[in-house]
């Protein structure tokens, strides 16, 4: 019998402390050294590592991630931890999956995945991308969906869509509801629903709607009427089937056959949950090698206002879902909820397994959630390996009264890294 040898344990805190960022093709630079500070969490000294940790190679993300979703991190973040802290066949988990960045990236890298999100739209947008369809089969399925010219809309959407576009959307919605109700819903239907959900509203002709806010920020009917008046616009016809095909081509443009096979293999074993992240009894104890996630922050997202069209299209009761989603306005309430999440993460994490917990700066940096999270994790039994502050400097171009300005800006990720004692 052949015994597979696992690589030596990766000391991530030492790696981060010694890391030097070198720009591509700069052969003579010694690189930008990591700045290391220490903070005291209760009586525990926790290192804080600051640098630009993603390399130019790591910044090249797969096109399969190009799905709009509010407050999502870039694929480079989970890839960094998945590559260093797991091996093929290990299980990667995200308790707040969102659009599925961690799940898709783990699948691309040959890991098993467990996804959870209290928002049912998460699974609708994530799961289908593990099963990339054959283009001919997809086109045939789309052409087979009949357009009902007499279908009536249960809500007024004339301010968003041309009447013929709306007929196509309503026909597709009814088709998907019927297929699911009769148990005929398959991978092709899931893919069509995912892409259509992403194309419902947006700010270019690549979307079904007239010009409106980006797709992750749906506006109300009254607000759209005002936008139409301000822009002196009326909805033009959009060919929904053609747009679904073109968005599909965009999503798979740089996905290799090997990656498609890896995603499908991960999808075949994947577990998708729609539970409170504090109560995921389906996940067995000590089975997860790595969790990479970003939780909901302090009342920064208005679920019902942002997602009412997406929920309507997918026959989801938006107010019911909104009530289930954590929107803590007080830091004390947020800490209490996250303590429950970390208690559950400790239960399901393997010995020597890791958690990478990304948090942002909220309320203009007045509340540093990373320090709160470090304390929460330590109190639940984890070892805090450090706080990783990834600072990516970029140049942003603005144009004011014909004068161009290049301003230096910084995108910052704060990731608190934990390990379970082995």
Q: What is the predicted role of each segment?
A:
Residues 2-88:
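S-adenosyl-L-methionine
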Residues 120-181, 316-324:
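Conserved phosphoryl-transfer catalytic core
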Residues 335-351:
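A short glycine-rich, Lys/Arg-flanked "PGG" loop and its adjoining helix->strand segment in the class I
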Residues 365-374, 382-422:
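Class I S-adenosyl-L-methionine
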Residues 2-4, 8, 12, 17, ...:
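Charged, often flexible domain-edge or linker segments that flank or initiate folded functional domains
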Residues 75-78, 90-109, 113-120, 126, ...:
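Conserved proline-anchored active-site loop of SAM-dependent methyltransferases
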Residues 178-291, 298-299:
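SAM-dependent nucleic-acid methyltransferase catalytic core
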Residues 296-337:
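Mobile active-site "lid"/loop adjacent to the S-adenosyl-L-methionine
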């Amino acid at each position: 019998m052949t015994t597979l040898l696992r690589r030596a344990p990766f000391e991530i805190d030492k790696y981060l402390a010694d890391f030097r960022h070198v720009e591509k093709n700069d052969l003579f630079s010694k690189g930008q050294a990591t700045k290391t500070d220490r903070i005291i969490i209760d009586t525990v000294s926790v290192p804080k590592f600051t640098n630009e940790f993603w390399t130019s190679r790591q910044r090249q993300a797969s096109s399969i991630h190009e799905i709009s979703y509010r407050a999502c991190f870039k694929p480079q973040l989970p890839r960094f931890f998945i590559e260093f802290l797991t091996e093929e066949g290990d299980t990667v988990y995200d308790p707040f999956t969102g659009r599925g960045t961690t799940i898709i990236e783990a699948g691309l890298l040959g890991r098993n995945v467990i996804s959870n999100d209290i928002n049912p739209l998460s699974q609708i947008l994530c799961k289908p991308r593990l099963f990339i369809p054959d283009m001919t089969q997809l086109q045939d399925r789309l052409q087979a969906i009949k357009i009902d010219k007499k279908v009536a809309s249960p809500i007024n959407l004339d301010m968003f869509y041309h009447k013929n576009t709306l007929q196509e959307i309503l026909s597709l919605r009814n088709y998907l509801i019927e297929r699911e109700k009769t148990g005929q819903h398959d991978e092709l239907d899931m893919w069509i629903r995912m892409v259509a959900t992403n194309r419902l509203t947006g700010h270019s002709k690549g979307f079904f709607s007239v010009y409106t806010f980006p797709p992750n920020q749906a506006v109300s009917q009254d607000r759209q009427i005002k936008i139409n008046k301000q822009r002196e616009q009326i909805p033009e016809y959009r060919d929904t089937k053609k747009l679904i095909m073109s968005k599909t081509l965009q999503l798979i443009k740089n996905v290799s056959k090997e990656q498609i096979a890896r995603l499908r293999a991960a999808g075949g074993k994947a577990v998708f949950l729609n539970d409170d992240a504090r109560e995921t009894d389906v996940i067995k104890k000590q089975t997860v090698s790595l969790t990479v996630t970003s939780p909901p922050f302090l009342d920064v997202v208005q679920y019902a206002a942002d997602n009412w069209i997406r929920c309507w299209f997918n026959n989801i009761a938006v107010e019911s879902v909104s009530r289930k989603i954590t929107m803590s306005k007080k830091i004390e309430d947020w800490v209490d909820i996250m303590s429950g999440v970390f208690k559950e993460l400790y239960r399901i994490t393997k010995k020597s397994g890791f958690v990478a917990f990304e948090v942002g700066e909220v309320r203009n940096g007045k509340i540093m959630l990373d320090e709160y999270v470090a304390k929460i994790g330590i109190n639940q039994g984890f070892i805090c390996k450090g706080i990783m502050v990834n600072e990516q400097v970029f140049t942003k171009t603005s144009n004011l009264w014909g004068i161009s300005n290049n301003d230096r800006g910084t995108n910052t990720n704060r990731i608190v890294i934990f390990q379970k004692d082995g």
